[in-house]
A protein has these predicted regions:
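N-terminal alpha-helical interaction blocks
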Residues: 1-38
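Short, positively charged, Gly/Tyr-enriched micro-motifs
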Residues: 46, 55, 60-169, 211, ...
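Conserved beta-strand -> loop -> alpha-helix junction used to position metal-binding or nucleic-acid-contacting
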Residues: 219-222, 229-270, 378
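Helix-loop elements that line ligand-binding/catalytic pockets
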Residues: 272-346
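Basic, amphipathic alpha-helical segments enriched in Lys/Arg and hydrophobic/aromatic residues
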Residues: 339-415
Length: 415
């Protein structure tokens, strides 16, 4: 004998009464219930109505499992008649524990969404015995495909970067993100990374929120920088990510290393050259990251190539400037001093970086204002790459936006 009161407690739904329980097979229970709530709201005029007009057609709703059983709640919604509207419209009662036209209770939908975090439609489909289309329908109902600006109070710092939707293709999308109330949020997935597309997105941000933006973090792509400048103007600092900058000046050292290693292969004995094994990895590390063996190999390389030593030391010096707790003005002076050292060295491996440095002087030195990086954007890029691999190369931007939101914010939303 099933105790209806205990079963009602397990269901976790109030204002209902269990009429009967049917065990259809060893895996499925159907619980027939009725609402104890009275009244509804007219779908015509929106006013409260209490004139009972019978019951609507029976509906089945998938609910949370109990003791390993699939659970379906079976209910005939009460209907009420409006005495005000012409034609005396009738309306079905809407209860707060399920959404009209959904085949699941709200609790079950949220359970499905939690299962989908860091997972795939296919895996959840197998686990819950649901079709992937049914799961995607829940996703579409609960997660928007664009950011909802209404609850957002401020943006402060915006990050923007790009990612290829298809491996090996130049099918790039721009990713715009921000920390909102301590949570990393994607606020835009743009079909193009052009200046016009990014500018249009920035202009789509409500004026009240555009006024709260203090900094835009980006790589050195001209389209992103130009779009941010055209919309936000001089009031907002455009900050070139220090790690993109570091990649450029470190590339200069690496290019020099390749040339010097080719020269050393010709000039050194095989034994002496082999003693420089793994030098290509070692030169890419900072001194404090090296092991004792790696330091010996690096010093050996420096003995054979003073030019690499000089370039390596200049690279380390610029990194030290970035790491130092200095103001923007101090940072500018230190970098100008570094540029003079490069000029005095007569090294040419930094020429490309120096050209970029002169072209984007303000954006690069804006890092020292608040020591901001777009590292959170790079982390988000890696997250999206994982989602794409896990979801078998998802290319639909709307679905990608939903999946990124779910993985980043799903636990807080559906806890």
């Amino acid at each position: 004998m099933i105790d209806k009161e205990q079963l009602l407690s397990l269901l976790g739904i109030s204002e209902i009464e269990i009429e009967r329980v049917v065990i259809e097979n060893p895996k499925t229970i159907k619980i027939h219930i009725k609402s104890l709530k009275d009244g509804s709201h007219c779908h015509g005029c929106g006013k409260a109505i209490n004139c009972f007009h019978g019951y609507g057609p029976e509906i089945e709703l998938r609910h949370l499992p109990i003791l390993g059983y699939k659970v379906y709640l079976v209910i005939r919604p009460k209907r009420y008649r409006c005495e005000i509207c012409e034609g005396r419209l009738t309306t079905s009662q809407v209860l707060d524990w399920y959404t009209p036209k959904s085949a699941m209770t709200t609790a079950y939908e949220q359970d499905v969404m939690r299962a989908l975090i860091n997972s795939t439609l296919q895996d959840v489909s197998l686990k819950y015995d649901l079709g992937t289309a049914a799961i995607q329908e829940v996703v579409d109902r609960l997660i928007e495909t664009k950011v909802n600006w209404t609850p957002i109070a401020a943006l402060n710092v915006i990050g923007i970067d790009e990612i290829a939707l298809k491996k090996g293709h130049r099918d790039f999308v721009a990713i715009v993100s921000a920390y909102i109330d301590g949570e990393l949020r994607v606020i835009g997935l743009l079909a193009e990374r052009t200046k016009a597309a990014v500018r249009d997105f920035f202009l789509s941000i409500p004026k009240r929120l555009r006024r709260t933006v203090k900094m835009v973090c980006s790589d050195l792509y001209l389209g992103f920088i130009a779009a941010a400048k055209s919309v936000f103007g001089p009031r907002v600092a455009i900050c070139a990510d220090r790690f993109h900058v570091a990649k450029l000046y470190r590339q200069g050292v690496d290019d020099l290393r390749k040339k010097e290693m080719k020269r050393l292969r010709q000039s050194l004995s095989k034994e002496a050259y082999d003693a420089l094994k793994n030098a290509h990895w070692i030169v890419r590390k900072s001194r404090h990251e090296l092991t004792a063996d790696e330091r010996r190999i690096l010093n050996r390389l420096f003995q054979h190539s003073p030019r690499i030593r000089e370039a390596y030391e200049l690279c380390e010096a610029l990194t030290a400037i970035y790491d130092a707790p200095v103001s923007k003005g101090q940072g500018k002076r230190k970098i100008r001093g570094w540029m003079q050292r490069v000029a005095n060295s007569q090294l040419t491996c930094f020429n490309r970086f120096l050209k970029t440095l002169n072209s984007h002087w303000e954006e690069i030195t804006n890092y020292f204002i608040d020591r901001r990086t777009s590292g959170f954007v790079e982390g988000l890029n890696n997250k999206i790459k994982v989602i794409k691999r896990r979801c078998y190369g998802i290319t639909n931007r709307d679905h990608l936006f939903q999946r990124v939101y779910l993985d980043l914010n799903g636990h807080a939303r559906f806890a």
